[in-house]
UniProtKB/Swiss-Prot annotation:
Name of the featured protein: N-acetyldiaminopimelate deacetylase
Active-site residues from the entry: D68, E127
Function: Catalyzes the conversion of N-acetyl-diaminopimelate to diaminopimelate and acetate.
Known catalytic reactions: N-acetyl-(2S,6S)-2,6-diaminopimelate + H2O = (2S,6S)-2,6-diaminopimelate + acetate
Lineage of the species this protein comes from: Bacteria, Bacillati, Bacillota, Bacilli, Bacillales
Gene Ontology BP annotations: diaminopimelate biosynthetic process; lysine biosynthetic process via diaminopimelate
CDD domains registered for this protein in UniProt: M20_Acy1_YkuR-like (cd05670)
């Protein structure tokens, strides 16, 4: 597949971002593109909006490569001529890149027999509610169980030509956070007859600021971010309800449990103080991304030998990724791919360099071609 074809495919994906488990147009574009490849050694199956392609290799050992598919509920502001056609949705996390790179790899190995069997996993719903865990729990792969698994994620902060990863912990444990307050509304002139949830909510927000500072080991890392606060309907009406939305991120599961326990204790105290009811919903939870140390070291060593590739020793990040569920099931590696964008992930102006697509494909073709069973 030529670079012009890859760029065309990436831009086609970019125009049709779809949210989790609704990637119907995306799935069709994937299947249409795959149908034009050499079919001799391919086996294809689907599950919901996911696509799985097995490539027959010479040795009875299977290496999986995963690419996520979904977009984000963000209104695009890139100014691209190929900007999103779906109002309020955008590929702002590079999943259009991820799929295009996977297709480039698949196209190569469809016509060049790989050393090992390859399994390409095009996974929906990474941004939520999560697609990796349901695929594993439903045993969708069946007999196509991989012995190793790999994936990449674009990094706007790294220059094109850079690849970064590390053995062990790479990304954090994450949890969504939705908190609903229920009190009693009333007239602003008669606060004694009401139960103000804006005030209760404000006290909760203030107390949450002590959770990490006074409950998490300073040598560990955790963050609680409350990104949405909503309450009230009119300036002279006391709010009967309020809502907070946020996220929890920790580098250890033990710290995640501590944070959740403290949030629930604070909620119980606010309930007693303000005679209200508080409901906490943790939404989607993603486990940490933990790279197999031996495989990560081998991938790093290979990357350092490649002309045109600058290998960077990555640091642990508070990023969340449901690829961690695959890594709990199968040994593997996730790595960062430099795309040199002036704007970051989840930014409405994200503009990754398309030059990185060809670099990633060339690198992973070489890696997978040289890969031997462990």
């Amino acid at each position: 597949m030529k670079m012009n074809d890859l760029i065309h495919i990436r831009r086609a994906f970019h125009q049709i971002p779809e949210l989790g488990f609704n990637e119907f147009k995306t799935q069709k574009l994937l299947l249409d593109t795959i149908s034009n490849m050499e079919q001799t050694r391919l086996q294809i199956k689907t599950w919901k909006t996911a696509v799985f392609v097995r490539v027959e290799g010479r040795q009875d050992y299977t290496i999986a490569y995963r690419a996520d598919m979904d977009g984000l509920p963000i209104t695009e502001e890139t100014g691209y001529s190929f900007a999103s056609k779906h109002e309020g949705a955008m590929h702002a996390c590079g999943h259009d890149f991820h799929m295009t790179i996977a297709l480039g790899l698949l196209d190569h190995f469809a016509s060049h027999e790989p050393e090992c069997h390859l399994l390409f996993i095009f996974q929906p719903a990474e941004e939520g509610p999560g697609g990796a865990k349901p695929i594993i729990e439903a045993d969708v792969l069946g007999a196509w169980q991989p012995d190793e698994i790999y994936a990449l994620h674009i990094d706007p902060n790294l220059p094109v030509g850079s690849i970064a990863t590390k053995p062990g912990l790479l990304f954090a444990n994450t949890s969504e956070l939705f908190i609903d307050f229920q009190g009693k509304g009333g007239h602003a002139a008669y606060p004694h007859t009401a139960n103000d949830m804006v005030v209760a909510c404000a006290h909760f927000v203030t107390q949450v600021q002590t959770v990490v500072a006074r409950n998490i080991d300073p040598l560990d890392s955790a963050v609680v971010t409350l990104g949405v606060i909503a309450g009230g309907t009119k300036q002279n009406v006391i709010a009967a309800t309020a809502r907070l939305e946020g996220t929890i991120r920790t580098l250890s599961m033990a710290s995640m449990e501590v944070v959740k326990s403290r949030l629930e204790a604070i909620a119980a105290g606010i309930e007693a103080s303000f005679a209200c009811k508080i409901a906490i919903d943790y939404g989607s939870n993603y486990c940490e991304v933990y790279n197999d140390p031996e495989l990560a070291e081998a991938f790093a060593a290979f990357s350092k030998t490649r002309k045109g590739i600058t290998f960077v020793e990555a640091e642990e990040a508070m990023t969340g990724e449901d690829f961690g569920y695959f890594l709990k099931q199968y040994p593997g590696v996730m790595f960062w791919l430099g795309v040199d964008s002036p704007y970051g992930l989840h930014d409405s102006r994200l503009q990754p360099s398309e030059e990185a697509i060809g670099i990633a494909i060339e690198h992973m073709v070489a890696f997978l071609s040289a890969k031997k069973p462990r």
